Amino acid sequence: MKTEILNSQNEEDFEKAVSILKNGGILAFPTETVFGIGADMNNESAVRRIYEIKERNFSKPLSLHVASLDVAKPYIKNVPDDAYILEKNYLPGPLMMIFDKTDLVPNYVTANLHKVGIRVPSNDIFQEIANRFDGIIVATSANKSGAFPASSLEQVLKSLDGSIEAVFDNDSVITGLASTVLDLTTRPYRVIRSGFITGEDISELLEKQVLLSDDGDISGTIKQLSKLNIIVVEGTRDNVLNKIKELYEKYSKEHEDKVGVLLADGSEEKTGILKHTKFLGSVNELDHMVESFFACVRAFENEKMDIVIVEGISREDRGWAVMDRICSYASEVISV
């Protein structure tokens, strides 16, 4: 099977996308964070294909991707008033809220859990698909489990070409920074995964305590699909950069110069110009730093590096979400 590329400027291609979903196919589409792959919630064989295509453990649930929270109402229950405050401020956008599910959500979607995640992407292409499709799309990120998420059409095709029916092109900016996942079934509410919207943002908006959790952590899973040893160094800036120089000198000798370094803009003034250095970008542009991380690591893979040493940034404000994302792919995190 050859994966078809759909044109977001072509009206007929949206109808084709809806037809694919109705007939049990798998469709890849952009969101404001990364590309996703989705299927019709009520087609069990199509949903199971998502797991098989991604090589995803069946114990991990999928989420419902909808055009608005209102569409999701028949599928969720015990919805707190706070959900509508969050909807007003953040949706559509990079926030997934977890609710108790109704019996209308099949157990094969939620891995037999009584909860379900609801995501309302703001991307215009997704919104158009969801509004035309008369069912519910269940989805997850468009990549093999444990691999870097896809933030471009080319990355989707590199990973999934031939295993899905179609993928939409995309002209919108995709950050690579994951959506925030907030569990509204617990008291206090719990941030399962940090993203563009921080726990502090949510706590301030709702005027109540919100806990942070590492339940969504996937540390080390990238090692299943990559030979890269990713080491993140975090702490005070001078200590971090001194440690990076130390590690670079050590590992360059041990690995015959197959060591890459990832620094924030300007840090080379402290470390000096180390061979195989790439840059994450400015700490003042955190929204683009995660995507820079993915792009640079992919480049290091192509250059046959063994080790990549990454400069950690401050975890203040949205820096927490950036570090949470980067560290989830690290084989080692060193605090100095």
Q: Model features per residue range: what roles?
A:
Residues 1-336:
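Active-site-adjacent structural elements in enzyme catalytic cores
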